[in-house]
Amino acid sequence: MDKRNHIAIFDLGKTNQKVVLIDGKDLTKIDSRKAPNSVLKGLYPHLDTASQWRFLCDCLSGFEQQHGVDGVAITTHGATAALVVGDTLALPVLDYEFELPRSVDEAYNTLRPPFDETLSPRLPGGLNIGAQLYFLQTRFPKEFSRTEHILTYPQYWSFRLTGLAHSEATSLGCHTDLWQPEMGRFSNLVGRILPEKLFPPLAKASDVFPLTSTAAQATGLRAGIPVTCGIHDSNASLVPWLKSGDPLSIVSSGTWTIVMSLGVPPGEMDAGRDMLANVDALGRPTPTARFMGGRDHELLTKGCVGSASLSDIAAVISKGIFIMPGRVPGVGPFPQARGGWRGAPPVGMAEKLASATLYLALMTQTCLALAGMGQRIILEGPLARNEPFARCLSALTGVAVHVSADATGTATGAALLLLKADHDPRLGPAVQPVDLPGLSAYAQNWRAYAQQAR
């Protein structure tokens, strides 16, 4: 009988947290559990790490009892760091959507490295980890001085399970201001402003370490099973495609819609349009453009149920109903825009859903043009389940759009790092592009309006 190899993946997004159990033999999903995340008040808005730990332990314990678990892989959202002293936190883990005090913001802007060094744009709130750390260092000097390790979020959870502290490039390269992607080393912010001794030795996202006996007691797992160092979630989506020979673009969706292109010359890197270089699991810079698509959709369709029909989309095109960028200000390819509707107002739920679908497709097309358009577009995450969106995107770009058939590209990529295995990703056939009268003119008008909003 073949040896069992069940991999549990802790997939911690900004909005939701999941633990997925995958069969390492064929990467099929065995089980999964999901829960919403919460942000707590206090010194500043911070993540509920205690609740996240309980959720992780409960899921792992349940999976061990029902199916057996042979290894744990970790992937989380970026722009988050934990300050660790001993086996606890020196300070709560700051929520990156917290709007930093203006005085801190202005002071940090004079200290951060230039874009051509970090390929990291200045982003609002705490989306640059460097800004978070500067805030904590200057506002809470006593607590900050106790810090032994600064850990990016995947590595914090690996630390909780293995007791070992590491730095890792995919999370450091996620618009932190802390990393030089082209050089593969820390930026001058580390050492000049932030003590270098607080950043532990580098490890690869695929490096594995044994589960401690303490963590084994908490999770019900066997001590010593392998746990990965952890990877930034968008980069986990790239892992199955890293050895693909064809130029392609990955659209990873969730709270953020993130476009990354492999083997494609990018457009000019424009810090003013939320472009950056992510770092893939092999340590290579990856041109990236993104916007807060999941958050946009949530705000635009609040109270709506279902999905848009093609007839509803055709009606929106015919009536000239437009959603402008900037519902979430300060991010995306139009960071100065302030959102709103243009043209005729939507009538009812159906037109809201249809307008939102067109908006997401047009914003994704814009990001693809910035990051570099591949010969194929692969959809991962919630947008992969939105057929009208996929068909509109194919029509707008003129490029074949495929929906990933994997249960979750993020979880699959994280599992592959532990398995040290290649994988032929499962794709369905290319979607059929929509053929809607007026779509091209509608898109042209939307782009003109969006440029005016810049």
Residue ranges and their predicted role:
Residues M1-V93, S103, R146, Q217, ...:
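N-terminal glycine/serine-rich phosphate-binding loop of ATP-dependent small-molecule kinases
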Residues A8-I9, N109-L123, N128-H166, D177-R192, ...:
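Active-site core segments that coordinate phosphate-bearing ligands/cofactors
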Residues S61-E97, P121-L127, P154, S158-Q180, ...:
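Short beta-strand-loop/turn "lid" adjacent to the catalytic site in phosphate-handling enzymes
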Residues E99-P113:
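Hinge/lid segment of periplasmic solute-binding proteins
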Residues G68, P195-L198, M373:
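Short loop/turn motifs at secondary-structure junctions
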Residues K34-L40, L94-R102, G173, T255-T257, ...:
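Short, acidic/turn-prone active-site loops that include or flank metal/cofactor-
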Residues R192-D207:
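A conserved helix-loop-beta module that forms one wall/lid of the active-site cleft
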